Each structure stands twice: as C-alpha cells, then as structure tokens.
UniProtKB/Swiss-Prot annotation:
Residue stretch of the organelle transit peptide: 1-63
Domain of life of the source: Eukaryota
Similarity comment: Belongs to the LIPC family.
Entry function: Required for normal plant growth. May be both photoprotective and play an ancillary role in photosynthesis. May structurally stabilize thylakoids during osmotic and oxidative stress.
Protein name: Light-induced protein, chloroplastic
Keywords: Chloroplast, Membrane, Plastid, Thylakoid, Transit peptide
Induction annotation: By light. Levels increase upon illumination and stay high in daylight, dropping back to basal levels in darkness.
Tissue specificity statement from the Swiss-Prot or TrEMBL entry: Expressed at high levels in leaves and in the petals and anthers of flowers.
Subcellular localization(s) per the UniProt record: Plastid, Chloroplast thylakoid membrane
GO cellular component annotations of the record: chloroplast thylakoid membrane
Length: 326
C-alpha cells in the first residue's frame, strides 16, 4: 500500500480510453492512469510514444516497442514524407558491336569517292580490307534463304566494276551529273529494277532496266534482263545565276547576260514541260546474252555486298539508312 501511495504522488495526465466491447453510451468513461485496475500484464510491457514535429513538410512518427501477436498497435511504422520522388537509374549506352564499327568505317571510307570513280589506290585498298572483314562476319551466310532482307530500294555507294566508270565520269556527260544509281528488289515477284537518275540544269531523267532473278544457290542468283525504260524528263527548279563568275583569275560580271539566259531558260522549260507529259519509252531486251549473276557475300537490314562477273564488287546501302548520311 505504501508503494501504491507513492505511485499516486507522481504527477501525470489523465488518459481517455473508449472500450470497444462495452455497449454504446453517450458518456465516455475515464480512468486515471494511477489506478491499479488499469495496469494489466500486457499494458505494463508496452511503451508508446507519439511525437509531433514542426516541419515545412509535415510528418507523423509512430513507434511501438515490445511488439507481440497480441499487441493491437502493430509493428513499427516507418517515417513517411509526402511528395517523395522515385529516381530511376539510366542504363549506360550500349557499346556498338564489331560489325557496326566496321560498317561505320566502311561508310566513312566511301565518302567522297564518287561511287568508286574518284577513289585513290590507297582508299581502294582500305575499302577492300573492310569489305573482307565484313564478309567474314556475315550474319546471313545464306542470303537467298532470307529473301525478305533483300526487299526494298538499295543505293549504290561503291563499285569496282569498270563498266560503270564511263557513266560516272562527268567528262563524258557534259552539263549532266549522275544523281543516283539504285537497285530495287521484290522477293515476292522475283523482280529486280536497276535505275540510273541523271540531273541536268533544267530537268532530271532516268534510265532503268527490269529483270527477273532465279535462286541458284544459298548465295547466288541469276538475273535475266527483260526490258529497258527511258523515263521522261522531269522539270527541276530554275537556274539561279551568280552576280559574277571567275575565269582565268578574272571576275566577270554576268548581269548583262541574265536577260538572254532567262529567255533561253523559259524556252527550254516549255519544251521540257511538253516532253514531261509523255509516257516513258519502253523497249524489250531480247538478247540471250543479257544475263548476269550476283553472289551476295554480306547481307543485313541496311548493307548488302554482292560480287559480280570478273570479281567486281558492289556496296549497296538500304534507302533511309543512317549509313547514307556523311
């Protein structure tokens, strides 16, 4: 009794408790914490502290100790701060494969060679070495068994075929340049179209051949040409003349000639417009010798390397590939 009397002398606040098992009443019962009837065995081992902090971001901290299965307060609650942001770590950039590096080096080596016409002997040797390395790592060793990869338009980027050099040479084609040489393949109909686009001062035109191909081996196809097509000229933008031109070290003012050149240009434009309305000219190719074969030594979704007669090599890049950009 002496210990209980001393306990009653400790100053404390009154704790209000609402019993969940009692019948509902309009009056809330209160019990002093100093009462001996209140301190049960379970409550004597419980310590509960609730703290409230003043913070720009309010938080509530609850802590429970001596937790057991009968503890109605549950386990310790972690501190929760509102407005948290989840941080996702970015993956490091993927390292390019050896094939991708070789293709990039090849594309860089082809730049400025005019499809092989202007390539020096040193550049040619470098290109041949890169082609050989790519051929040894061909991801599709049986290209004719992956015909869907052949589909689409392929732009000629380089060739060692000397038969195309006169066509590529500007000296043999005054005032005309070769704008594009391409090959379009349709594996469903087994057709191939080779096309050369020429660009002049006022118009562009094209010459193309249509052919059928047959699969002869996992790498080789036989091509037979059937017809040729000469496209009608398509009018381009007007010629923009400079104020002066340099000739033999002297600047010559060409402004007095602009009127004459403009009248000639207008006349030529009217002629080109009348021709452009005409259908293209088609002619059959009946020569039995109009055949060739191609051996595809490298193929992926953006690069194709075939070899032709006499060991000539061609490098073609799929239209839209980043390899076409310098």
């Amino acid at each position: 009794m002496a210990s209980i009397s001393s306990l009653n002398q400790i100053p404390c606040k009154t704790l209000q408790i609402t019993s969940q098992y009692s019948k509902p009443t309009s009056k809330i019962s209160t019990l002093p914490i100093s009462s001996t009837n209140f301190l049960s065995k379970t409550e004597q081992h419980r310590s509960i502290s609730v703290k409230e902090f003043t913070n720009p971001k309010p938080k509530f901290t609850a802590q429970a100790t001596n937790y057991d299965k009968e503890d109605e307060w549950g386990p310790e609650v972690e501190q929760i701060r509102p407005g948290g942001v989840a941080v996702v770590e970015e993956e490091p950039p993927k390292e390019p494969s050896e094939i991708e590096l070789l293709k990039k080096q090849l594309a860089d080596s082809l730049y400025g060679t005019n499809r092989g016409l202007s390539a020096s002997s040193e550049t040619r040797a470098e290109i041949v070495e890169l082609i050989t390395q790519l051929e040894s790592k061909n991801p599709n060793p049986a290209p004719t068994e992956a015909l869907t990869l052949l589909n689409g338009k392929w732009i000629l980027a380089y060739t060692s075929f000397s038969g195309l050099f006169p066509l590529l040479s500007r000296g043999n084609l005054p005032l005309v340049r070769v704008e594009e040489i391409s090959q379009t393949i349709d594996s469903e109909s087994f057709t191939v179209q080779n096309s050369v686009v020429f660009a002049g001062p006022l118009a562009t035109t094209s010459i193309s051949t249509n052919a059928k191909f047959e699969v002869r081996s996992p790498k080789r196809v036989q091509i037979k040409f059937e017809e040729g097509i000469i496209g009608t000229p398509q009018l381009t933008d007007s010629i923009v003349l400079p104020e002066n031109v340099e000739f033999l070290g002297q600047k010559i003012d060409v402004s007095p000639f602009k009127g004459l050149i403009t009248s000639v240009q207008d006349t030529a434009s009217s002629v080109v417009k009348s021709i452009s309305s005409q259908p293209p000219i088609k002619f059959p190719i009946t020569n039995n010798n109009a055949q060739s074969w191609l051996l595809t030594t490298y193929l992926d979704d953006e690069l194709r390397i075939p070899r032709g007669d006499a060991g000539s090599v061609f490098v073609l890049i799929k239209e839209g590939s980043p390899l076409l950009k310098p």
